Swiss-Prot record:
GO terms for biological process: antibacterial humoral response; defense response to Gram-negative bacterium; defense response to Gram-positive bacterium; defense response to insect; defense response to virus; innate immune response; response to Gram-negative bacterium. The keyword Glycoprotein does not apply. Pfam families: Cecropin. Belongs to the cecropin family. Keywords: Amidation, Antibiotic, Antimicrobial, Immunity, Innate immunity, Secreted, Signal. Residues 1-23 form the signal peptide. It is found in: Secreted. The keyword GTP-binding does not apply. PROSITE patterns: CECROPIN. It comes from Drosophila erecta. GO terms for cellular component: extracellular space. The lineage of its organism: Eukaryota, Metazoa, Ecdysozoa, Arthropoda, Hexapoda. This is Cecropin-C. Coiled coil: none annotated. Cecropins have lytic and antibacterial activity against several Gram-positive and Gram-negative bacteria.
Length: 63
């Protein structure tokens, strides 16, 4: 009977510990995904600016 109480107690402690570490791991993954999204957004904005400048140069060259 004491073994069952000890087993349940140890299992509870492990579940709490693993639950907290999983949240940290998921948070890090979320931050990485967010950073990738920000870089993609910035690259798109920069690319659109370059394309607009190229279109302006082409329009100026045509007259």
């Amino acid at each position: 009977m004491n073994f069952n109480k000890i087993f349940v107690f140890v299992a509870l402690i492990l579940a709490i510990s693993l639950g907290q570490s999983e949240a940290g791991w998921l948070k890090k993954l979320g931050k990485r995904i967010e950073r990738i999204g920000q870089h993609t957004r910035d690259a798109t904005i920069q690319g659109l600016g370059i394309a607009q400048q190229a279109a302006n140069v082409a329009a100026t060259a045509r007259g």
